[in-house]
Amino acid sequence: PACRISQMGQAGRYMTEYRELRKTYGILDIIKTPELAREVTMQPINAFDLDAAIIFADILPPLEGMGLDLEFIKGEGPVLHNPVRSLADVERLATPDPKEALWFTLDAIKLTRETLDPLGIPLIGFSGAPFTLAAYAVEGGGSKNHDKVKSMMMGEPDAWHQFMTKLSDVVGQYMLAQAEAGAQVLQLFDSWVGQLAPDDYRERVMPYSKRALEIASEAGVPMIHFGTNTNGMLEDIRDAGGDVIGVDWRIDIDVAAKRLGNSVAVQGNLDPVALFAPWQELEPRAKTVLDRMQGRHGHIFNLGHGILPQTPVDNVKRLCEFVHEYTSK
């Protein structure tokens, strides 16, 4: 059978249709209007030969539901105006019911399923993982060194434990609610976990990712667990949970697959920047990923992280077609 392909962040700024919509609406407006979220989710499905849709959402609204003031600032990205810096800050945080705090994404999932079902294309729901959400919440936005969040993790164990416990509940319940709303696959994104030493991951992060995935697993749908820069802790990511482990481009995918063993499928791992290259450069890179996984049970072809804003649409189209043609021979 042809290899399955989906692409992280497959809806978004590289598509003209999305840029048109953004002239009128801010990103949070789109996410919080289920009809618009469905429209954006469907844009790549209508344009490319993809095997799955990914709900158009963002990892940060769960933090808003907990009481943080989120704003997307043009040119800066997300900013949280009241970051979490102390035990008192942690204690103030709510653990909201996702059906109330995140109703818009759940409604978007229901609506999108109505459109996708006749096409026979499944819908993927997702959430940020506890550590990645903590990183945004403590830093107050994106960060180069993640010194504030790591300082809390190392220096304030009580605050850290309480915070990560709250986050794991929120994330687990949110993923569960997405599956109940109709998501047929769930993905946990731990985008910043590669900033950690493996020991710190094992002792101070992994138990909470595991807890979130255990809560979500009650839904009985396949789960993808993805982090970037995880070569130092691949086996730990696997042991935290997930049926599919996503890997980035910084490791040969066959090496990652060998380390992960046969209990999980593997997703990845083309460098997103390869999509900027001319086709004669892009094609052999895609071929290499597929050849390295040939004959292995369970591979989802994907990028090693999110698709970048200026990505040429023609290359995305050709890549989707190529993956299906090459693997169905």
Question: What positions do the PLM features span?
Answer:
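Flexible, glycine-rich active-site loops centered on histidine and acidic residues
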Residues: M66, L70, L87, R296-G298
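Glycine-/small-residue-rich beta-strand-loop submotif within the FAD-binding core of flavoenzymes
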Residues: L21-T24, L70-P96, H146-S151, I253
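Active-site loop segments of alpha/beta catalytic cores
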Residues: A101-K329
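Glycine-rich, aromatic-flanked loop segments that form ligand/cofactor-binding clefts
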Residues: A2-G12, L50-L80, K99-K144
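N-terminal basic, low-complexity leaders that serve as flexible interaction/assembly modules and, when applicable
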Residues: P1-L68, F72-K74, D291, V313-K329
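Intrinsic-disorder/low-complexity, polar/charged segments
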Residues: T33, R85-S86, N145, P278
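Basic, amphipathic N-terminal segments that precede the first structured/catalytic domain
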Residues: R19-E20, T24-A37, D89-L106, K110, ...
